[in-house]
Design a protein with these regions (language model features):
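Structural beta-alpha unit
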Residues: 10, 27-62, 69, 173-215, ...
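Glycine-rich, Arg-bearing micro-motifs that act as flexible, cationic patches
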Residues: 64-83, 207-230
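Short, flexible loop segments at boundaries between secondary-structure elements
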Residues: 92, 233-242
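Hydrophobic alpha-helical segments and helix pairs
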Residues: 58-103
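Small/aliphatic-rich secondary-structure junction motif
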Residues: 1-12, 105-155, 161, 170-177, ...
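A structural signal for isolated positions on well-ordered beta-strands in alpha/beta enzyme cores
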Residues: 37-39, 107, 140-142, 181-183, ...
Length: 242
């Protein structure tokens, strides 16, 4: 009973400190005209409690801060962040420590080939999201589709590029996006998103994610994890509509 009482007291003291600290931020933002409130909770696993609270609150967007390791400038997602990517049904904004430029540049990553049983409507949701965000921020956006021709060495030369070009063009024909903002890249998704994001000097990547079986996660989940870990910009993760 003593241990239980001590634990409860320590937990309350810790939560009280967090509440006081957060209230300072709330007061400052409220003074700037924002309608904002704060809440501190104690739960395990934390990501489940976060998702539950966001759904009960009726949130349109969940924001998670991702810290970099100072010495190597590497953004490694915490367990909670990665679980949110996999399980949060809401749009999830992973915020890094890079500052946005004066003119915001966004990059949407799509897969019109619908690989790995990706829902057909997800790419449309990604374009809708990047269009909405860029409009609200007064920025511009580019659309990227990556494929790796070398991944299928026994396919006739040019066949893979032809398939992906047709799928990409057919999909984008339904949207009013200038050709100079459309990029078809012969590279694996990991390196394409990382390198082209740096080339465009983008401030945010908008990409999709789907919940997979444990077997599928073991086989292809590492690709998504590498993208999320190594890309330095903010990432907006979109989930398929129910």
């Amino acid at each position: 009973q003593t241990i239980t009482a001590d634990y409860a007291a320590m937990r309350k003291e810790y939560c009280d400190r967090l509440t006081e600290s957060m209230q300072g931020m709330v007061d400052k933002l409220s003074a700037d005209g924002f309608n904002i409130s704060s809440q501190v909770g104690w739960a395990h696993p934390r990501y489940e409690a976060i998702v539950k609270e966001a759904q009960e609150f009726g949130a349109d967007l969940l924001v998670q801060h991702c810290r970099a390791f100072a010495k190597i400038k590497h953004i490694h997602l915490t367990h909670d962040s990665w679980q949110l990517v996999k399980h949060c049904p809401l749009p999830l904004l992973l915020v890094k420590d890079e500052e946005w430029g004066d003119s915001v540049v966004l990059m949407a990553a799509v897969d019109p080939m619908n690989s790995h049983h990706k829902p057909v409507q997800l790419d449309g949701q990604i374009i809708d999201a990047v269009t909405s965000v860029s409009g609200q921020l007064g920025g511009e956006y580019h659309v990227v589709h990556a494929y790796a021709e070398s991944a299928r060495p026994f396919t006739p030369a040019g066949k893979i590029k032809e398939e992906h070009t047709k799928a990409f063009n057919d999909f984008m024909s339904g949207y009013n996006v200038n050709e100079d903002k459309l990029h078809l890249i012969d590279e694996t998704p990991v390196f394409a998103l990382k390198d082209y994001s740096e080339t465009l000097d983008s401030d945010m990547i908008v990409m999709g994610a789907i919940s997979r079986s444990r077997l599928a996660e073991a086989l292809i989940g590492s690709t998504a994890e590498e993208v999320l870990d190594f890309v330095k910009t903010d990432i907006l993760v979109i989930k398929p509509s129910s």
